[in-house]
Amino acid sequence: MAARPLITVHSDKGAASESNVTLPAVFRAPIRPDIVNFVHFELKKNGRQPYAVSQKAGHQTSAESWGTGRAVARIPRVRGGGTHRSGQGAFGNMCRGRRMFAPTKTWRRWHRRVNTTQRRHALVSAIAATGIPAVVMSKGHCIEQIPEVPLVVSDSVESIKKTKEAVVVLRRLKAWPDVEKVKNSRRFRAGKGKLRNRRAIQRRGPLIIYGTDNGISRAFRNIPGITLVNVNRLNLLSMAPGGHVGRFCIWTESAFKQLDNIYGTWKRPSAEKSHYNLPMPKMTNTDLSRLLKSDEIQNALREPKKDKARRLQKKNPLKNYRVMMRLNPFAGAQKAAAKAVEQRRLKEKQAKLDQKRGIATPVEGAGKGRPRKTTAKPTKAKAGKK
């Protein structure tokens, strides 16, 4: 929210004058984009024009079903002959030249009623957002050279009657780049709106809010992107177009001074809106980093645990050799001994097989000469009974 107590009034020459105005309380109101978006979405429906298709559309033909037994669908079919149209399906929404499903009616619920207090809260939030430069720049407005936000000009601007004088004022206030942005953004609309007298679209420019119309509306109305509105006729559709807060606003001094009287303050209610009190923010200070680092909160918090034991992954020593060696260093010797026993057993088994088959078995430690040949002893046949 805007927190400056005084706002400088700039003259129509673009220079800062010696007079200051107090920042109205409405600029310190809480910003609720959710309320603004909902209210804008509902109010935008009130400008729709009812439309409907003709009640006779799709039924201006003579058609009757052929019934069953003809191996064709039971959809009504056009009578007659001698043309391609005869025998074709009609009336159903699945047919060519048919009526639509659920034809639109003019007695649809076009308009929406929004609670009065909800509309006022949305407008107050939109006004408060116009006083924050970061929000205005995020909306796409070119305000890098603007002397101050919110921008307040003297009441002499309300008496301007020529457009060329209005252009000079905008150039002196460094607001002309935002108008140039609007001029460069003009382009053809996507879709069928081009065929319905809505060919071009463009961005939104500054919103000029005045107190008394002494010619200001005729001077500024032909500048691209400029919107003019009386301070007593502020509405959400012009203050937050598209339901997005943060439009660049130029206030006249008389209009800026009337805001406290129109929307009230936290000490007194509004003088022009019956039973309306300015919404109170939930937090007087929205700087969370400053709040969390304050002494009051830091003293109530415990110190962070720096020696916190981290959970390690527990591995199965029966499957992981390194973990087993760390738990039982003798496991390596046991494994080597078991491996040696297994190798000796395999050698003895192979030697027995070689001896039975009459194969020379190489002797360990012998040279590279011929291997020693072992012959099996002949076995004596036992004398059997005849």
Curated annotation (Swiss-Prot):
GO molecular function, one term: structural constituent of ribosome
UniProt keyword Ribosomal protein, yes or no: yes
Bias type Basic residues, positions: 369-386
Record keywords: Ribonucleoprotein, Ribosomal protein
Biased composition annotated in UniProt, kind: Basic and acidic residues: 341-357
Location of the region described as Disordered in the Swiss-Prot/TrEMBL record: 341-386
GO biological process per UniProt: translation
GO cellular component: ribonucleoprotein complex; ribosome
PROSITE patterns xrefs: RIBOSOMAL_L1E
PANTHER family registered for this protein in UniProt: 60S RIBOSOMAL PROTEIN L4
Family: Belongs to the universal ribosomal protein uL4 family.
Name of the protein: Large ribosomal subunit protein uL4
Source species of the chain: Urechis caupo
Source species taxonomy: Eukaryota, Metazoa, Spiralia, Lophotrochozoa, Annelida
Gene that specifies this protein: RPL4
